[in-house]
Amino acid sequence: MSLRKLTEGDLDEISSFLHNTISDFILKRVSAKEIVDIDITVLVEYTDELKVDISAELYLDELSDADPGIVDEAVDAAYRSLESFLDGFRE
């Protein structure tokens, strides 16, 4: 099943889904008190196919013992969950 023609609103919805998935993943595993900042950038483009680029940075308090590698796990989880989310956009 292929994706239907995606609108700008669809792309915004996909981008928000990915952003929220990453943020939720991190916040479930790291106390908000340990986080100085989270920078998540999601670029979603659609011409003939869907292109998704995600970058994320996690800035932790210097006293935090959380593994900064959690951000990579969060991005991987977002990519994995994207496929089932896209089912709502298929023809």
Curated annotation (Swiss-Prot):
InterPro entries: DUF3194, MTH677-like_sf
Superkingdom of source: Archaea
SUPFAM superfamilies listed in its UniProt record: Hypothetical protein MTH677 (SSF110783)
Pfam families the record matches: DUF3194 (PF11419)
Family under the similarity heading: Belongs to the UPF0440 family.
Name listed for the protein in its UniProt record: Uncharacterized protein MTH_677
Organism: Methanothermobacter thermautotrophicus (strain ATCC 29096 / DSM 1053 / JCM 10044 / NBRC 100330 / Delta H) (Methanobacterium thermoautotrophicum)
